[in-house]
């Protein structure tokens, strides 16, 4: 893998002078190897190592090089045609291959090559971009989007119209990460490398970016960029110091342990905050 990484890194440093005509066959093969590895789950743009998320920027560089070097081509989807640099993941998939994958793909769900979809995942009419990693047992509901390089854990439910932000550039930016057993409510947006830790529930219409204040009503603390494990989060507002206005925030209304999260329904967890 090191030689593959070195080849990608060197080419990216010299990307301004590269074209499809000048790129070596070794480089083209390396880019295709990375895209195939992302597609089958061999590679991940981000992974948890010793309890911390590590981002492999060189994989993002390979994707960006593919955009620069590969020409647009016609993609025949049967009901219409597309014109893009990256083919669709399931265009040539046979019945046997679908059965082996264990994935259900409802008509009009779109997945680009280079996104990994694990078994027991259901894709309603939705969009999954290149470099995304979707683990086992995930539901991606209607009109939801999973952006480039986003990382989705096991047994996550991404509700209708929700958006999980993607990131390829700038290279220093981290992907958005939803850890295991999380629920993302309808029309919510989680973007800009925000991490939602395991067993959390995000209510409908919650917007989370790096500049979004996250208010913990239990402790009174304000944080940014990360939802702690087991949090139940709703949309809210915080007043200004002079009381002249209020600004949007996300509110952690409670935190539950894994056993409670498993036993109590999503609706009960969200309704509980209305009694206070």
Curated annotation (Swiss-Prot):
It catalyses: (S)-2,3,4,5-tetrahydrodipicolinate + succinyl-CoA + H2O = (S)-2-succinylamino-6-oxoheptanedioate + CoA. Coiled coil: none annotated. Substrate binds at residues 104, 141. GO terms for cellular component: cytoplasm. Gene3D superfamilies: Hexapeptide repeat proteins, Tetrahydrodipicolinate-N-succinyltransferase, N-terminal domain. Keywords: Acyltransferase, Amino-acid biosynthesis, Cytoplasm, Diaminopimelate biosynthesis, Lysine biosynthesis, Repeat, Transferase. It is an enzyme of class 2 (transferase). Pathway: Amino-acid biosynthesis; L-lysine biosynthesis via DAP pathway; LL-2,6-diaminopimelate from (S)-tetrahydrodipicolinate (succinylase route): step 1/3. It is found in: Cytoplasm. InterPro entries: DapD_Trfase_Hexpep_rpt_fam, Hexapep, THP_succinylTrfase_dom1, THP_succinylTrfase_N_sf, Trimer_LpxA-like_sf. GO terms for molecular function: 2,3,4,5-tetrahydropyridine-2,6-dicarboxylate N-succinyltransferase activity; nucleotidyltransferase activity. Its main location: cytoplasm. NCBIfam families: dapD, PRK11830.1. Belongs to the transferase hexapeptide repeat family. Homotrimer. This is 2,3,4,5-tetrahydropyridine-2,6-dicarboxylate N-succinyltransferase. The gene is dapD.
